[in-house]
Design a protein with these regions (language model features):
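Extracellular/periplasmic ligand-binding modules, especially the Venus flytrap/periplasmic-binding
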Residues: 15-74
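Extracellular/periplasmic bilobed ligand-binding domains
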Residues: 1-12
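Glycine-centered flexibility sites
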Residues: 2-3, 36, 61, 82
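Solvent-exposed loop/turn segments at secondary-structure junctions
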Residues: 10-14, 45-49, 105-106, 120
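Solvent-exposed, acidic/polar segments of extracytosolic/periplasmic ligand-binding ectodomains
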Residues: 2, 73-135
Length: 135
């Protein structure tokens, strides 16, 4: 799997922050401690969704559906998962995807490293990849 590329919504090394979960590394450590495995991006995005709903209910100061919907539509915040801002159609338009590359050390231990966008990269993309005969 070394050198394989994969797009994802989130990685624990991204430097987004919030007041509840703090950052991705803190979230991942707490998740690992609780569930005994690393959090997939789906868990992170679900946790961030709860922060968005909490914020919307507080700004709406109501459980009225229209007020909550309007508060959600006006959301513009950062969470440990990333920036959250909704377009008129409901899509989050303020959070880019990330690209991983599988990188292995000399012992054979492999892990995903963020290689793009460069603003969030934790490693440099290896391309072109070495020929099979050079590995």
């Amino acid at each position: 799997s070394q050198y394989a590329l994969c797009a994802s919504q989130w990685h624990k090394t991204l430097t987004y922050k919030d007041d509840f979960f703090k950052d991705g590394m803190t979230y991942a450590a707490d998740f690992q401690k609780q569930f005994d495995y690393d959090p997939p991006y789906q868990s992170a995005e679900s946790s961030a969704a709860l922060l968005v709903f909490k914020d919307a209910f507080e700004r709406a100061d109501s459980f009225d559906k229209k007020k909550v919907r309007d508060a959600l539509a006006a959301t513009d915040m950062q969470t440990f998962y990333g920036n959250i801002k909704f377009a008129p159609g409901g899509q989050n338009v303020d959070k880019p995807m990330v690209l991983f590359q599988v990188m292995c050390d000399s012992s054979g231990k492999c892990e995903n490293k963020v290689v793009a966008p460069t603003k969030w990269a934790s490693a440099k993309l290896i391309h072109p990849i070495p020929k099979w005969s050079d590995r």
